[in-house]
């Protein structure tokens, strides 16, 4: 079944939208986190159609040309840039654990949302002070 969220890459978006968000961010290179960062930038300009195709194969070669370089910590970079974790973004914004049924709306602000947001803010505070 198709699902809410994204395969991360490949994505199909209009060139105008790519240019509006500035494509991939350099602070995530080389390494992890550029795909969720790109999706967050899309979310912030109002894109709400994130659909993963269930009946498709995606082959990812894990940056074969970059294997010998030191990778960034994409999860930490994402947290410090956006104030929330990739996991929180996938769960509450993209709703990646659900079958695709509609264009997404704003996250539901319930106890689960605020508890997760609180954890993100504690992690943000910790990393902004202790990991320079």
Give residue ranges: language-model regions.
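Non-catalytic, C-terminal membrane-associated alpha-helical segments of glycosyltransferases
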Residues: 70-76, 80, 88-132
């Amino acid at each position: 079944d198709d699902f809410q969220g994204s395969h991360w890459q490949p994505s199909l978006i209009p060139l105008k939208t790519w240019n509006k968000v500035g494509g991939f961010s350099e602070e995530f290179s080389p390494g992890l986190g550029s795909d969720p960062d790109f999706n967050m930038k899309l979310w912030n300009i109002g894109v709400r159609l994130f659909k993963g195709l269930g009946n498709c194969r995606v082959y990812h070669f894990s940056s074969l040309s970059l294997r010998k370089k030191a990778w960034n910590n994409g999860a930490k970079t994402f947290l410090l840039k956006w104030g929330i974790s990739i996991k929180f973004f996938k769960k509450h914004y993209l709703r990646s654990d659900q079958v695709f049924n509609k264009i997404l709306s704003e996250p539901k602000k319930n106890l689960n949302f605020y508890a997760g947001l609180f954890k993100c803010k504690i992690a943000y505070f910790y990393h902004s002070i202790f990991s320079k």
